[in-house]
Regions:
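Flexible "arm" and connector segments at domain edges
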Residues: 1-61, 65-130
Length: 130
């Protein structure tokens, strides 16, 4: 694992590790196998959530993220870029929602999740129309 800096963000590091081991042939043949592995890891996470052991939950959650990162590699998606793009989109939509609610003279802290969700859906539509 030499050549993979320890200081990298975890998702970037996982991606680099997977690229590195691919170079020596330790890799899946196709994306279907990777998807199946991801589903297996999700099932293992569900089991640990039911048991309630936080250490095991964190471990299995990490396995899910690692498998999902590997799947991203197979479908030619940079997971770091994809997550950052989603973060930015979420922030923009949330800001639109906040503004809509503020313009109506309402306070988000006094709204139910169901009420906020109506504004969230409006914000999504407004964002998509830009």
């Amino acid at each position: 694992m030499e050549g993979v800096p320890k200081s990298l963000p975890a998702i970037v590091k996982a991606f680099r590790i997977q690229e590195k081991v691919r170079g020596i042939g330790f890799d899946w043949d196709d994306k279907t196998q990777v998807w199946d592995k991801l589903l297996e890891e999700i099932e293992e996470l569900k089991v640990e959530i039911e048991k309630g052991d936080n250490d095991r939950i964190e471990s299995e959650f990490g396995d899910v993220l690692f498998a999902l990162t590997n799947y991203a590699r197979f479908i030619n998606v940079n997971p770091e870029d994809a997550l950052e793009r989603t973060n930015k989109r979420f922030i923009k939509r949330f800001q639109i929602m906040e503004n809509e609610i503020r313009e109506k003279g309402m306070d988000m802290s006094e709204m139910s999740l169901t009420e906020m969700d109506v504004y969230w859906e409006k914000a999504k539509m407004k964002y998509l129309s830009k």
